[in-house]
Amino acid sequence: MKQLIHEEKTQTTCVLRLFGAPLWTVQQAAQQADIAARCRGRGAEVLAALQAETPAGLEKARKALNGRFAAELYGEGETTLVHAAVQALETHRRLLVCCDADAGTLLEARLETVPGAEKVFDFGALSYADAKTREKLSARTCRVKGGPIPAKLARVQAAQRFVGADLAAGCVERAEDTVLFLGSRRGCWVRTVANTDAPALWLLDMIRRAASGLPQAAGTSWQKYGRAVPADVLTVQTLPDKPENTAPAKPPRKRHRVRNALIFLLVLALAAVAAAWYYTGGDLTALPQRLQSLGADSLPHAGAKLI
């Protein structure tokens, strides 16, 4: 124990784990806070390796990123997302069930590796794997019209109520994507994820955030029971892309140069008019004759010698 405390007090490096934050936002936040960080992204997960000269500097960097990414930051070091989800359920005393075997397949293989997961997840014993509960769920959803999405939303609500769980998970697997559902007493979070984008991890992150009372990631929508799910929610949701550079374009600068040149020429013209007015005594019509007389005076007279 003393050794661990000593290591914490002298630690100058650490690795923070985030899920649901675009890589570019983490890099930008570290740069703005003057934090020495190497960031690496894989899918929706980002690992940020922090380094500081002193333990106090490292703690300051930790707090800065935690303040910026409170919902996305789920752990440090070797902590995995599934461990973070189980810890959130345990800490806040939330019970999780699945309304169907598809959602159970996404979660069970990962949760069974975490000690104590059976305290917060039923592994189907009280829900979809129980014959009586499964019969009740089927009876509830067979009357729902509109296709698999409204039926799944009703099944999630029924599973949460019949079992008395705090959270109920479900999913609709399609050819190229999976629609994830996580229901509570008041409503349901819905997110559509590409099958290549690890739907199981997204569902675990939704569970972690919901259990902890944290806001869901961008693209995850809140849906009330009994209402139609909007079509845009049923399309694949991705994290925000980095905005393009908003530096001034070159054409406006060219227009500024042309305007300045015109102003300069106008000033020269006004100066010429003023000089002509002074030279002719206000009679500008005599200007051509005056100019001719100047030209005649400059010509050599007859008999003059050129030196």
Show the residue positions of the predicted features.
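Short alpha-helical segments enriched in small residues
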Residues: K2-E8, F19, L23-Q31, A56-P240
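A generic structural motif
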Residues: A44-P55
